Amino acid sequence: DIKNPISTVTNTKPITKTTEHVFFKLSSYQEFLKKWMDDNDIQKEIKNKLSEWLSGGLVDWDITRDKPYFGFEIPGLKDKFFYVWLDAPIGYIASHKNYCDKNNQNYLDDWTEGSKTELYHFIGKDIAYFHGLFWPAMLEGSGFRKPNGVYCHGFLTIDGEKMSKSRGTFFNARTYLNHLQPDYLRYYFSSRLTNKIEDIDLNFDDFMARVNSDLVGKIINIGSRCAKFINKDFDNQLSAEIGNNELLESVLSKKSEIIDNYEARNYAANMRVISSLSLSLIHI
């Protein structure tokens, strides 16, 4: 035990208080969550982790916090706020409604039970239980449809180290965008991203090599060379016929593999397939 605890923020001693809280009856959704995980697309590693919660029996979830607290104050309850992970996922529905309102669509077409829309969440591995237990139970209890799948990724490290502002090992998106195109980074992440729960390391030497060698040197090079020939010799007009059916068939033969890789969320495998195709085209 700490003999003389003092808050480093307020310089005062903590005291014991009695308070009332509101709970979400998560325990009532035990069987529903088991079935939902079995019927939908959840990675094996994440499913095993979530099953540990279920095997011990779910307990009801405290969804309130006392003032001072950030977030939404609960109407009718004095100095009580919703716990941030209760209201945060609801932002998915709110942001989608905002999009639909701007495009003359009804957001409920996508969020009601029986909707044909496929709904997937892509999240970090540290918030799997919020999206794999609490959120589906909330949706079930409120009559909304549930996600078709939840895909978890690992963390992003910088040159082999965890992100830390104090140590300077962090990545500022705005600074990056002030100097380089976002597609370079999208390609780099795609070339490293599999369907496993693995961290991705952003190494800038590797980033530069992959972008220059694979993206620019192979894939973009094809478009650049073709554009010059089409402009110079063919008045910017494409042929109405395929002059090399064997080449076309070799490219189309990879169609199913590419589709399967995307369905499996194995983006790195697809980048290798596409890079291999581009290399074969360069050497024609």
Locate predicted features.
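Conserved small/polar residues in nucleotide/adenosyl-binding loops
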Residues: I282-I284
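Long, non-coiled-coil amphipathic alpha-helical linker/lever segments
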Residues: K255-A269
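Structured secondary-structure scaffolds
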Residues: P5-K232, S239, N270-I274, L279
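Cys/His-rich Zn2+-binding cysteine-cluster or related metal-binding knuckle/ribbon modules and their
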Residues: D1
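Acidic, turn-prone loop/beta-hairpin segments
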Residues: D205, D235-I259
